[in-house]
């Protein structure tokens, strides 16, 4: 696809208006960001762009914030994460979980993905959502300290899913939190060099975080009085 608009004479505008392929996607992404920042309201043009991307079978769509492009994801998966973000935003005890999860999603699936940020924001989303449940009196709680709290006081926590006799109800939640925490390779540096998260691991981290945020904000994981 190529822009068929007569380009102005200056070199920058000429390159902009004659972009194609990946370059054109970058142009569209940048224009959407500019439009949102400048608060330009053009619903008709946005709908036309959405229709063009759909009809062309593009791997990208206009994101929910209308400020950029994002890679297409199965609608059911995207809608589940969107619902989790909306629900978390309505739970005061979840703090900034919704904002962190939304940022993580965009960093993982946006036109210019940032795996390190996506993973970091995923952890922050879970920390925000779980704080009031796991360590409500710890002002500087992290996912690491919360895992320590679970390990030291397992009997204090319950989950909505029935657990067979003799089984530990908090273990599945703990395992997901542990996987997310231990999987962050960029947290610390060392002599061998810091290893950044891959895009695949960052995207997996976002979905782990979405599930955990939903559990904590919905009351599926609770702390006994």
What is each PLM-predicted segment?
Residues 68-152, 222:
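Amphipathic alpha-helical interface elements
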Residues 42, 63, 118, 132-133, ...:
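General "foldedness" signal
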Residues 33, 58, 106, 130-138, ...:
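Charged/polar positions within long, soluble alpha-helices
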Residues 1-8, 12, 25-28, 48-51, ...:
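Long, charged low-complexity segments
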Residues 15, 88-95, 109-117, 167-171, ...:
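Short, solvent-exposed segments of well-ordered alpha helices
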Residues 1-99:
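Internal, Lys/Arg-enriched amphipathic helical interaction segments that engage polyanionic partners
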Residues 35-38, 56, 60, 88-91, ...:
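Short secondary-structure junctions and interdomain/linker hinges
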Residues 21-25, 97, 119-122, 126, ...:
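Short runs of predominantly hydrophobic/aromatic residues within well-ordered alpha helices
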